[in-house]
Curated annotation (Swiss-Prot):
GO terms for cellular component: cytosolic large ribosomal subunit. HAMAP family: Ribosomal_bL17. Part of the 50S ribosomal subunit. Contacts protein L32. It holds the Pfam family Ribosomal_L17. The lineage of its organism: Bacteria, Pseudomonadati, Pseudomonadota, Gammaproteobacteria, Chromatiales. This is Large ribosomal subunit protein bL17. Keywords: Ribonucleoprotein, Ribosomal protein. The keyword Repeat does not apply. GO terms for biological process: translation. The gene is rplQ. GO terms for molecular function: structural constituent of ribosome. InterPro entries: Ribosomal_bL17, Ribosomal_bL17_CS, Ribosomal_bL17_sf. The keyword Ribosomal protein applies. Belongs to the bacterial ribosomal protein bL17 family.
Length: 138
């Protein structure tokens, strides 16, 4: 019996599940928006949100904890230098899960997982890219 056992198994063993969520979290931090199944999206929230909370305070110890979970230096750097400061004032709820229909092959319910306030970040990034292009042309 699995009474009072938290979390979803998702038909995978423990190592596969950990690797999958590590990769999903890294993809979410890299792209800031991913498409996956609804159960994976809901479970991803339990993995990714604590990492963003950890990134709000940039210390060596927190970077090591994040690296232990992600195993990707590039994503840890982005997490602590971009996402952490971006969500500094937000007390939680860094992700948005939007249902987006069903997968064609097997009918699995799909979801779009986004980081909240993503539009502002994209607009700011576009402005800096445009400024960089203008200075490069001059």
């Amino acid at each position: 019996m699995r009474h009072r056992k938290a979390g979803r198994h998702l038909n995978r063993d423990n190592a596969h599940r950990k690797a999958m969520f590590k990769n999903l979290a890294a993809a979410l931090f890299r792209e800031e928006e991913i498409r996956t199944t609804v159960p994976k999206a809901k479970e991803l929230r339990r993995v990714a949100e604590p990492l963003i909370t950890l990134a709000k305070e940039d210390t060596t110890a927190n970077r090591r904890l994040a690296f232990a979970r992600l195993r990707d230096k590039e994503m840890v750097t982005k997490l602590f230098e971009e996402l952490g400061p971006h969500f500094k004032e937000r007390p939680g709820g860094y992700m948005r899960i939007l249902r987006c229909g069903f997968r064609k092959g097997d009918g699995a319910p799909m979801a779009l997982v986004q980081l909240v306030d993503r539009e502002e970040a994209i607009a700011a990034r576009r402005e800096t890219e445009e400024d960089a292009e203008e200075t490069a042309e001059a």
